[in-house]
Amino acid sequence: MPASSIDSDQFRRILSRNVAMPLGMGVLSALVFVGIIAYLINVLSWVEHSERVIGRANDVSRLSADMEASMRGYLLSGDREFLDPYTLARQRMGGDLTNLARMVDDNPAQLDRVRRIRTAQNEWELYAEEAIRRRAREADVVDLVKSGRGKNLTDEVRRQFAQFIEAEDSLLQERNSSSRNVIGWSVASFLAFSLIVAGLLAW
């Protein structure tokens, strides 16, 4: 075989070893790294989502508490200025619960809890409207308050909110744990892959 042919074959092998292989491994390493980062971002986005859901649920829960406190203040004083927070909160409540439902529409269990919150809140609002009408007519509201119906309805609203937030907090803890695990195995996997690539290039 002519020497030039041998030299050409050797040159191609050297070129493949010193240029093509490192370039291919570099591209493969980049793809692996991008895949790991994309997966990690996805996991962290769900953590952030749960945090937003919990924050929104707490806001809506406070809105409900403001309505209850405002209504109680009016029943005690008869001053309609006490109803301003109640009126404003009532105008927002329906829309805020709808937005909360949209945030968890991928989770049937949480979506059902929002429906139960809405039902409990609507029942309380019916009671509140009845109490406010009685007070406006200067009718006796003592018996209505003493019946305990308002307290029971308020407790039910709070219980439903607490169950929703507790369930979402459990999801948050699971997702936080998952994100830590992903970070751990991602770093270990990438280091192992890098060592394998380095070994192949050195071989």
For each of these PLM feature ranges, what is it?
Residues 196-203:
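Cytosolic-side ends of inner-membrane transmembrane helices, especially those
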Residues 3-11, 36-48, 68, 128-191:
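Juxtamembrane amphipathic/coiled-coil helical coupling segments that flank
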Residues 63, 74, 83-148, 152-156, ...:
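Heptad-repeat alpha-helical coiled-coil/4-helix-bundle sensor or tether segments in soluble regions
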Residues 78-80:
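Short loop-to-helix capping motifs
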Residues 21, 25, 90-91, 193-196:
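Transmembrane alpha-helical core residues of multi-pass small-molecule transporters
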Residues 15-67, 103-121, 182, 186:
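Amphipathic alpha-helical segments and their boundaries
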Residues 2-3, 7, 99, 103:
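Juxtamembrane segments at transmembrane-helix boundaries
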